Amino acid sequence: MTPGAEQKPFIVDGTGQSLSYCELCARLVAAQPFRSVCHARGAAEIFYQVALALSRGRRLLLVDPELKPHEIEQLGVDRESPEENLAPFTLPDVASLLERCRTSEGFELELLTSGSTGLPKRVVHRFAGLTRFLRTSARHRDDVWGLCYNPTHIAGVQVFLQAFLNANTMIDLFGQSPATIQQRIVEHGVTHLSATPTFYRLLLAEVRQPLPQVRAVTLGGEASDPALHARLREIFPSARIANLYASTEAGTLFASDGDTFFPAEGIAKLIAIEQGTLRLHRSLLGEFQGAGDVSEWYDTGDKVEIVATEPLRFRFVGRDRDWINLGGEKVNPQEVEAQLVQFPGVTAARVFGRKNSVVGQILCAEVVTTGARDETALRDFLAARLHAIKVPRLITFVSALPSSRTGKLLRS
């Protein structure tokens, strides 16, 4: 344990207020009563409640504070969950807290899927699954994590666990402007970032100076592209850059070498790729609540391209539901976006389908650029690199692209 860990900030929230590990321990010891549903606003309060459930071996449901009361009711969630009085206990120091959490029995964390294809589902995770690929050792004791994800979603929880179990500080960057994010990275000495490609594209559009103190940059949640990686290497020259694959249903499963993913040791036999679609064995999944029996193989909806079979290596090419049907021809929007961001000055792009009475849908693009808004030159550039059907019929220049609460690009 780092000397002085008690005084180290546990988290610095979006307003600049901090909660130290010493203060966290005091709150955990004094906590009464315990409620099994967390509908709090703010990462500091949310992660305090997760730490409480973890240290006491309890089950906790995290509910996004942006969910409306009727949506919560549809999920069968009782926001006024019964109170439970907790038995007294002591925490002499932070090391005792972390040891108690690592050996806690009975802890379960219930999360909601993003609900991008309907009402969210409830998925229960246990400590072993949530920490499957976390690294805890003395070499990580000085890491400072930027929290770029929604704290009620799987990616945010895993950033919390990686930081918390090493007694690291988290700096809340979620929902902040690019200028504020850059300022807070410098001010608080952030060394590790984990975020979606959309988050990085929005940030890089504003950042002009390198940030050499950042040592690790991880991308997840969406497909990335070589142009983004090149730009990340410019702004974060000291950082190791990697992609990760995680989902609310399964947690983190794959790491990457560039844009090529590989399963962690021991789970290769629990991965199947059929007709380009990634499937996971149900033993890798959390427990679905109220969904009946889950079939043996779970369809992730992710389309992949196999690079090698022994050992298994593959690339993600997009989400099955994101493909756009243009008069019978299916187009992967991420393929078009990858070409758009190759055009000089283009920092981000969104490709989507718009309803059309003749062909069903037409291909549209929104583009963020720091250069001249030359649509003709951009169309010529795309025409030289893509089949004609993949060149958007409608191109609109915009100042920013919409993103979801999970930090991903909104396509609908």
Language-model features: locations:
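Conserved AMP-binding/adenylation subdomain of ANL enzymes
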Residues: R132-V144, T152-T191
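Conserved pre-ATP/AMP-binding loop-to-beta segment of ANL
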Residues: T2-Q7, R41, L91-L112, R139-W145
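AMP-binding/adenylate-forming catalytic core of the ANL superfamily
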Residues: L193, G301-K390, A400
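Conserved AMP-binding/adenylate-forming core of the ANL superfamily
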Residues: P3-P33, I72, H125-A128
